């Protein structure tokens, strides 16, 4: 901000009076903005505060114009079925450059945002994936059987009773599978599978 040099004369004091009707053009300093070629007046004296308020209100008006312009772009892109995130980000940066001629930019360069796909990616073919999914119950049952046999050998009565009830219910479900498939049709994947014969399991001891 420029300052007055030399002794203060009565002529200079007239600038600080509130009843100034006309501003002398010789007392204005024109600062050029090299980016946009715009001129901003820097007023000497107490009228500098009024000029600052006027420029600030102008900047707020520009911000409102930018926001309305972005909202209109969002309404145009609504319902098109495309991802509007990158479009709005690029448009917001371009609009801020056009609107904020004399602003201070805190973000010099926008980093590229990594695009993540929410859809699951299958690295296996459908046949091998189905085979792997079908082998999961067998592995689970085999592990459960081994754990049950260990608990029976250790002699925990309550654990043995609970496991016996669970195993009996599982055997009952296996016996009812053929009848349930005919009564309640399910997915073709299950219908095409041949029900394996159930091997006779020796009765488990209660004690």
From Swiss-Prot:
Keyword Magnesium: no
Primary subcellular site in the record, as a coarse category: virion
Alphabetized Pfam families for the sequence: Corona_I (PF03187)
Entry GO CC: virion component
Record's keyword terms, sorted: Virion
Family label: Belongs to the coronavirus I protein family.
Record function comment: Structural protein that is not essential for the viral replication either in tissue culture or in its natural host.
Further facts: The gene encoding this protein is included within the N gene (alternative ORF).
Record-given protein name: Protein I
Lineage: Viruses, Riboviria, Orthornavirae, Pisuviricota, Pisoniviricetes
Gene designation: N
């Amino acid at each position: 901000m420029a300052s007055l040099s030399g002794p203060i004369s009565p002529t200079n004091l007239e600038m600080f009076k509130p009843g100034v009707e006309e501003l002398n053009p010789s007392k204005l300093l024109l600062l050029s903005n090299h980016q946009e070629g715009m001129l901003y007046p820097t007023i000497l004296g107490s009228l500098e505060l009024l000029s600052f308020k006027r420029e600030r209100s102008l900047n707020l008006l520009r911000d409102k114009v930018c926001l309305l312009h972005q909202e209109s772009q969002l309404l145009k892109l609504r319902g098109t079925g495309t991802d509007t995130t990158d479009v709005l980000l690029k448009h917001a940066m371009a609009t801020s450059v056009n609107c904020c001629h004399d602003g201070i930019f805190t973000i010099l360069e926008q980093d590229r945002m990594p695009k993540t796909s929410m859809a699951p990616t299958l690295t296996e073919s459908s046949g091998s994936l189905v085979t792997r999914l079908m082998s999961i119950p067998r592995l689970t049952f085999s592990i459960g059987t081994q754990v049950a046999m260990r608990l029976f050998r250790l002699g925990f009565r309550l654990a043995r009773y609970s496991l016996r009830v669970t195993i009996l219910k599982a055997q009952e479900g296996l016996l009812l599978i053929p009848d349930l498939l005919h009564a309640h049709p399910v997915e073709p994947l299950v219908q095409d599978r041949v029900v394996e014969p159930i091997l006779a399991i020796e009765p488990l001891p209660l004690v």
